[in-house]
Amino acid sequence: MEALVYTFLLVSTLGIIFFAIFFREPPKILTKKTK
């Protein structure tokens, strides 16, 4: 049970950081990597 909570917290924090960076600047690097 504890492991599940810790993993959930880790994923949520990573998601928040990713969204913050994604919305702060346009995804120019991401589009270049995919293409």
Curated annotation (Swiss-Prot):
Swiss-Prot/TrEMBL keywords: Chloroplast, Membrane, Photosynthesis, Photosystem II, Plastid, Thylakoid, Transmembrane, Transmembrane helix
Coiled-coil region: none
Membrane topology, record value: Single-pass membrane protein
UniProt subcellular location: Plastid, Chloroplast thylakoid membrane
A Pfam family assignment: PsbT
Main function: Found at the monomer-monomer interface of the photosystem II (PS II) dimer, plays a role in assembly and dimerization of PSII. PSII is a light-driven water plastoquinone oxidoreductase, using light energy to abstract electrons from H(2)O, generating a proton gradient subsequently used for ATP formation.
Protein name: Photosystem II reaction center protein T
Originating organism: Saruma henryi
Gene it is expressed from: psbT
